[in-house]
Amino acid sequence: MSFQIRVFTAILAVLSLFTAPVLAQNSGPLRIEITEGVIEPLPFALPVFEAETADAADVAAQITQVIAADLTGTGLFRQIEPDAFISTVSSFAAPIQYADWKAINAQALITGAVAVQGNQLNVKFRLYDVFSGAEMGDGLQFSATPDGWRRMAHKVADAVYSRITGEGGYFDSRVVYVSETGTKDARQKRLAIMDYDGANVKYLTDSSSIVLAPRFSPDGQRILYTSYETGFPRIYVLDVTSLQRRGLESQEGTMSFAPRFAPDGQTIVFSLSQGGNTDIYRMNVNGGSATRLTSAPSIETAPSYSPDGTQIVFESDRSGSQQLYVMPANGGEARRISFGPGRYGTPVWSPRGDLVAFTKQNAGRFHIGVMRLDGSEERLLTASFLDEGPTWSPNGRVIMFSRETQGAQGRATLYSVDITGRNLRPVRTPEGGSDPSWSPLQR
């Protein structure tokens, strides 16, 4: 059984929400073991990438550190400390002494080299299966300007993750969120964007008005969000590169909010309140008339498309309490999918199409959870004073959300967790953070 198949089988088992804990069924030594629901991370060796030019030493070390952080941050990989190395990789082209790496129980070995040539940074890497004594696939090379070194590191980590698990990675992605300062009764909010790991934070709006619910377009180039700058909620479209923005058409006396793109990138759905009623509407992102999709005498909000664009999941209190429903993308009969105790909200469809993530309030606690599209196999992943606003990683294996602490200060912090409820981790931001939206992989 190949390295990829052995490891991927085990990873799928630990990441599967719907299988009992198992032990990876293979006799080979290269595997991730799962015993009684506990994962044994894959040990890997990562020597500092070789500097092929004199001015590349510092950036080579930085790239190596980011790759290690990406992989270990998943909870699926464990880095072997360099002090344990028996031999070093003298150059990128040098033959690999597999016995030395096997002796320290490394199951994977990652080597690489970095060169700076004028205004171009070149990064190349190779991945080796230590126990079979073979390279996994061909080496890859990425190029960018020197200030793009973090993206190059994320691209290498994505490639390693993909080759070992057989699934796409999520490291070369970004997150837009609401940056928050001040106390609860005087909170200032502005849009911010960052790398998935909290690096390279940039602010997209000022704090002169409240902003809510930023949502990426499918290509990651535009952001929908709600702003109160006119005194009532209105939806805006922001270009990520130019920072140019425009407000969507709105009628006097209406409030529009909770926007989200359809998979085609041209259609949006949102909630619109008028005449005491709140329903879900659809319109072209470039403007035009809006089509009403729901008409129940209740509050209908937080719509999210299925990956194929044929269905919409949303929240509604039409049954008397806040619950989740699925309807055709063109409107029509909706079916309820949440039936547990408590209230459900902020549903978002997994990019894999198999699950819906949601916020649940029950017995004085808030949870982030997932369920299947028929409402079965609900699992709560977190619990705290206030967890809300889930968003999916590009590969559908990790969820980011915001958590607010109790008290007058009530600082909101971003967290991530995998779909089994393991590997709960804070995402560091300069200020408080809420309402995240995860981009697709960058191009």
UniProtKB/Swiss-Prot annotation:
InterPro entries: 6-blade_b-propeller_TolB-like, PD40, Tol-Pal_TolB, TolB_N. Its main location: periplasm. Disulfide bonds: none annotated. Pfam families: PD40, TolB_N. GO terms for cellular component: periplasmic space. Residues 1-24 form the signal peptide. Residues 424-443 are annotated as: Disordered. It is found in: Periplasm. Gene3D superfamilies: TolB, C-terminal domain, TolB, N-terminal domain. Keywords: Cell cycle, Cell division, Periplasm, Signal. PANTHER family: PROTEIN TOLB (PTHR36842:SF1), PROTEIN TOLB HOMOLOG (PTHR36842). Part of the Tol-Pal system, which plays a role in outer membrane invagination during cell division and is important for maintaining outer membrane integrity. The Tol-Pal system is composed of five core proteins: the inner membrane proteins TolA, TolQ and TolR, the periplasmic protein TolB and the outer membrane protein Pal. They form a network linking the inner and outer membranes and the peptidoglycan layer. Belongs to the TolB family. HAMAP family: TolB (MF_00671). NCBIfam families: propeller_TolB. This is Tol-Pal system protein TolB. It comes from Roseobacter denitrificans (strain ATCC 33942 / OCh 114) (Erythrobacter sp. (strain OCh 114)). The gene is tolB.
